[in-house]
Amino acid sequence: MRNGLARLGALALCAWLAACGGGDKPWHATDITGSMPKLQFRMQRANDAEIVSEQNYRGRVVILYFGYTHCPDLCPMTLANLSAVLDKLDTQAYDVAVLFVTVDPDRDTQPVLAQYVHGFAKQVEGLSGPPNGLLALTRRYRVMYKVTKDTPGHPYTVMHSNSVFFFDRAGTARLVTTDTGNIAGITEDVKRLLSSN
């Protein structure tokens, strides 16, 4: 009997320590805090043709995504899902920026990219840059892409990673996901980032 009570007491203590100790609520996306570099770039914003950097977005939660306007499915679906998240955030959405970086700058000129992002939430901004700038940014966040031009002058596809990165108000990389269909979960994550600092 005494051993049974001792065992029960030990289990209760473990449960109490678990509740009081590492009680941080898990994220819906994957926590990458400390494993990826801070937000840093210098590119042209398609919406107004201005040259912008991470400093333009300091104080806002930034969602970073790489794709291209001729993408048949993943890109429009991802941006539509993120737009739905912004809609759920209501007025908090003004403190969020979704940056869509094109990996196909040859076709995604400033007017083309501006028109494309116009079809989504107004917090979605298109970014483009020279090949060396794009390469540096994709390497910084370990994003893979490959342009496949089989026949010169004909339509081509671009293979690319579908990772979506989340940065807090200080520009620190916090989360990554490839599942933007979990709109409620992402909305909850973004709200936590908005209130964290």
Language-model region placement:
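Structural microenvironment flanking redox-active thiols in thiol-disulfide oxidoreductases
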Residues: M77-L137
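Thiol/disulfide oxidoreductase modules built on the thioredoxin-like
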Residues: G133-D189
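Bacterial N-terminal signal peptides that target proteins for export
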Residues: M1-G9
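Short loop/turn microsegments at loop-to-beta-strand junctions
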Residues: K38-L39, V62, S161-S163
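Extracytoplasmic/luminal low-complexity segments enriched in Pro/Gly and acidic/polar residues
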Residues: V190-N197
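C-terminal motif of bacterial Sec signal peptides marking the signal peptidase cleavage site
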Residues: W16-A19
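Short active-site neighborhood of thiol/selenol oxidoreductases, capturing the structured segment around
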Residues: S53-T78, L82
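N-terminal "domain-start" segment that seeds a small globular fold
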Residues: D24-E54, A80
